[in-house]
């Protein structure tokens, strides 16, 4: 338990890489695995990452490009429309 109290899921790396790197990994993993909202149908918890930057909703079936660890990039707030290939 002592390894994961501060760094959470990044505790799997043990004492390797240093605590500051493992804290950054903790923050990234927390954002990646939190329940995300689908920008098309609005359902929460149905969005899954297909690969790096590719996200898909299991409810409505839409697939879109987002950021590597979150379904919407920082620029997405400026662009309301999505380009969807399907």
UniProtKB/Swiss-Prot annotation:
GO molecular function terms attached to this record: large ribosomal subunit rRNA binding; structural constituent of ribosome; zinc ion binding
Keyword Zinc-finger in record: yes
Keyword tags: Metal-binding, Ribonucleoprotein, Ribosomal protein, RNA-binding, rRNA-binding, Zinc, Zinc-finger
Requisite cofactors: Zn(2+)
Record's function text: Binds to the 23S rRNA.
GO cellular component: ribonucleoprotein complex; ribosome
Family under the similarity heading: Belongs to the eukaryotic ribosomal protein eL43 family. Putative zinc-binding subfamily.
Gene: rpl37ae
Cofactor: binding comment: Binds 1 zinc ion per subunit.
Record-linked PANTHER family: 60S RIBOSOMAL PROTEIN L37A, LARGE RIBOSOMAL SUBUNIT PROTEIN EL43
Protein name: Large ribosomal subunit protein eL43
Subunit structure: Part of the 50S ribosomal subunit.
InterPro entries xrefs: Ribosomal_eL37/eL43, Ribosomal_eL43, Ribosomal_protein_eL43, Ribosomal_zn-bd
Organism: Aeropyrum pernix (strain ATCC 700893 / DSM 11879 / JCM 9820 / NBRC 100138 / K1)
Binding site for Zn(2+): 38, 41, 57, 60
GO annotation terms (biological process): translation
């Amino acid at each position: 338990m002592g390894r994961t109290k501060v760094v959470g899921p990044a505790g799997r790396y043990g004492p390797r890489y240093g605590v500051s790197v493992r804290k950054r990994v903790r923050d990234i993993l927390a954002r990646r695995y939190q329940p995300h909202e689908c920008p098309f149908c609005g359902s929460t918890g149905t969005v899954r990452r297909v690969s790096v930057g590719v996200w898909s909703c299991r409810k409505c079936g839409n697939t879109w490009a987002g950021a590597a660890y979150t379904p919407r990039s920082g620029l997405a707030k400026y662009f309301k429309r999505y380009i969807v290939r399907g």
